[in-house]
Amino acid sequence: MTEDETRAELIDPKLRLSGWEMDDAKVNRNFPITAGRIQTGGRRSQAIFADYVLSYKGIKLAVIEAKKADLGYGEGVSQAKDYAEKLRLETTFATNGKEIYSICMKTGREELVDRFPTPEELWNKTFSDQNDWREKFAEIPFNDKGGTWKIRFYQEIAIQKTLEAVAQKKQRILLTLATGTGKTSIAFQIAWKLFKSRWNLNRDGARLPRILFLADRNILADQAFNDFSAFPDDALVRIKPSEIKKKGAVPTNGSIFFTIFQSFMS
């Protein structure tokens, strides 16, 4: 039995039996993790794909590494852990369709299990507390800007971790990202979910949030302002230092404000 046959005849039925591929429980097959590291000369190394990624309520919860039925499940354990680490997932599985080996990256617990967990079981394992804002954020899809933008795995991790911290009422969140990783895109998607879910400091959904995008140069603030064009026009406000000096106050007639640090320096 080939690996493809193992997936179709042994693994897929087990996933369906546990309630996956129903309603909000998604099974992402051959999920692209990375396009491959860029090497000398501009060539890329081999792309990395996970056999399965399980998502529930819009959040990725686990990865599965599949091996063909005549191999031991242990052949996939190392890859299962590696993919879970890359995707920052707490739970991962290695399976040959006959046996299922469960690994918790958080506690280090590893064991053979009789079946895959149901979507609700996996959700409760990952999130021990009930949090309405976590689910509200997850319900808002990413804005793909008319199909011109595709999220990278590390961007999704950054966005998800940030929104989880917001849902947990964390007051300070710091993301450290290298040049070229798409920091503005990450900021856009975070703002998009906050805006669409009507999150605000009162956490009551009664009004839209106010979000400040700060840059150190006007050209960067202008670029960000243009990159946020998917928002309604009346939600975006470009603040110029000269306008603050002239009016003596910061405008508040919007939701997303763009300016430079110097705007707040005397």
Question: Can you say where each PLM-predicted feature lies in the sequence?
Answer:
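Short, solvent-exposed loop/turn elements at domain surfaces
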Residues: 266
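Conserved motor-coupling elements within RecA-like helicase/translocase cores
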Residues: 242-257
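ATP-dependent helicase/translocase motor core
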Residues: 1-62, 67-211, 215, 219-235, ...
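Phosphate/diphosphate-binding loops
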Residues: 95, 240-242
